Amino acid sequence: MAREYPLEKTRNIGIMAHIDAGKTTTTERILFYTGRVHRMGEVHDGNATMDWMIQEQERGITITSAATTCFWRNHRINIIDTPGHVDFTVEVERSLRVLDGAVAVFCSVGGVEPQSETVWRQADKYGVPRIAYINKMDRVGADFFRGVRMIAERLGANPVPIQLPIGAEDSFQGMVDLINMKAIYYTDELGTTLDEEPIPAEMEDLVQEYREKLLEAVAESDEELMIKYLEGEELTPEEIKAGIRKATIAVKMVPVLCGSSFKNKGVQPLLDAIVDFLPAPTDVPAIQGVDPETGDEDERHSSDNEPFAALAFKIMADPYVGKLTFFRVYSGTLKSGSYVYNSTKGRRERIGRILRMHANHREEIDEAYAGDIAAAVGLKETTTGDTLCDEQHPIVLEAMEFPEPVISVAIEPKTKADQEKMSIALQKLAEEDPTFRMYTDQETGQTIISGMGELHLEIIVDRLLREFKVGAKVGRPQVAYKETIRRPVKAEGKFIRQTGGHGQYGHVIIEIEPQEPGKGYEFVNKIVGGVIPKEYIPAVDAGIQEAMANGVLAGYPVVDVRATLVDGSYHEVDSSEMAFKIAGSLAFKDAAKKAQPVLLEPVMRVEVVVPDEYMGDVIGDLNSRRGRVEGMEPRAGAQVIRAHVPLAEMFGYATDLRSRTQGRGTYVMQFDHYEEVPKNIAEEIISKRQGA
């Protein structure tokens, strides 16, 4: 079957935003106007098409990014709806990795909120071209221009409005199109009929000022346009659009539009902007990768004629078809029923069926082409971030990095019968979500689950009950402490056993030293002259890592250490991998005790929005939680307090803040960094752990 839409007419985009900016509503309206949905879904009613997991409909937030295909002006648009809640940054990170462009939705009242900053930084990391859509122009306190200013100041971007709102709050009627210089009014309830009229007289000066800014930005993107502009010639709408497209794709400019998705105003021009300004797969650079056989760098261009290469970016358990693997095809084509090579795992797998997803219904397709986003049924071994490719031309695409979980809870099944079901279910959930981990605590035998925040773990427990019918009891949340060392130390590990026949002999001398925070573990082998045979070196490394899983202070994992194997000895007969593994482990434990071990705790970036009269009280409370207040700023009749607070002090904060501010305060927090726990508190934690 030939491809329906040429690559140039394909757009792979994400819709990203803060939690309440109206992202899901905007996506719903896009699906309505592009004809995929016959009745608009409302998040308020809990029936939005994209939010198809039951938990999402109840909570009114988007948790998993559903991929949907729709059509506008003879273009195919694949949309990935991403969650805006900080506990789900992994979903955002995954979807940005496979997108070519994005629409950032902002609330006209809140402007740039903390989650918008996080998502924006993630998009910067992957160099994703963006257009901004300032939504909720009908709300009290709507301020388009403040939104634009905040995009520049807080995100360090170059926002250039290509529309200006006509009116605001309840008098918001439409917008001025600065490219074609006309006013657009919405006349019917559903927003399907647009009236074009001359620009209102009272807006002429403002329009002129912003038209000038737009022309300047466009001229800067292209030398020919710059010459034309400087010579005072009029630029045609086509030239302006071409200039905006060029600057947007080069991530030198962010075109800004406005609207009110809920009131059905502004969505069609947004669709036009997606088609006009966001890149096709052919506009973005070739995807980089590595040839797994030679280790050489390699790349794949967006073309059906190159060897097949795709990235699996999401795994979902589907009640009807089993495991669904969402993937983005970067090059080549893939037929259903064919075999692919998973180069990350070095395994060959068979693709059963290929599905194109529309929020929660699906159509089966025979073949996926370069630039497509689709879901495969039948891949057993593939997990998030794996590369699928042609076995004759293997390539490993750069995988994604996911943040470490910061919060853990002990979980136990309500009945004996649930025990086995629970571990299978948790295993499946961990496959879907790389920021969710499960392990068994060696000392207590409890099952511990860890994730990115309280909401994240709540939803996991909720899914256990609904999808897997496993009842579970959850303990109190625990902080994921870590340990590290503060000074370099040399130590020796000897494991010698003489029993009848073969004995055991392993002897190593290692040096350990602190690495800078976040650098992780590094093993360096400096053995020369074969004092320890080559085949035993990996065993020493494994032994050290095993010892690092349980630190010397309180049994927490040790991080940011470089271990160097400098010397040792072996025995012709008695040495074995096992003996060297134990020697490595003993050496590390001994070294860590002498290397000034310290306890680290996760510190969160917290942003609290409260009415003025509660500000003093809330700041006092943050200080009492060992918080450092970094700054404050007024926002729409309230105060925004930014602070860094240890996670250990933030449990139950939501309830506390509600009672302190009579339900008027809100807050968001996300992981920022690890830092050393103050001595007196560290002693308490250690004695509790040892007492347990």
From Swiss-Prot:
Residues 8-282 form the tr-type G domain. One of its GO terms (cellular component) is cytoplasm. Its main location: cytoplasm. Signal peptide: none annotated. GTP binds at residues 17-24, 81-85, 135-138. The keyword Nucleotide-binding applies. Keywords: Cytoplasm, Elongation factor, GTP-binding, Nucleotide-binding, Protein biosynthesis. Gene3D superfamilies: 3.30.230.10, 3.30.70.240, Elongation Factor G (Translational Gtpase), domain 3, P-loop containing nucleotide triphosphate hydrolases, Translation factors. Pfam families: EFG_C, EFG_III, EFG_IV, GTP_EFTU, GTP_EFTU_D2. One of its GO terms (biological process) is ribosome disassembly. GO terms for molecular function: GTP binding; GTPase activity; translation elongation factor activity. InterPro entries: EFG_II (IPR041095), EFG_III (IPR009022), EFG_III/V (IPR035647), EFG_IV (IPR047872), EFG_V (IPR035649), EFG_V-like (IPR000640), EFTu-like_2 (IPR004161), G_TR_CS (IPR031157). It is found in: Cytoplasm. The keyword Repeat does not apply. Belongs to the TRAFAC class translation factor GTPase superfamily. Classic translation factor GTPase family. EF-G/EF-2 subfamily. HAMAP family: EF_G_EF_2_B (MF_00054_B). Catalyzes the GTP-dependent ribosomal translocation step during translation elongation. During this step, the ribosome changes from the pre-translocational (PRE) to the post-translocational (POST) state as the newly formed A-site-bound peptidyl-tRNA and P-site-bound deacylated tRNA move to the P and E sites, respectively. Catalyzes the coordinated movement of the two tRNA molecules, the mRNA and conformational changes in the ribosome. This is Elongation factor G. It comes from Moorella thermoacetica (strain ATCC 39073 / JCM 9320).
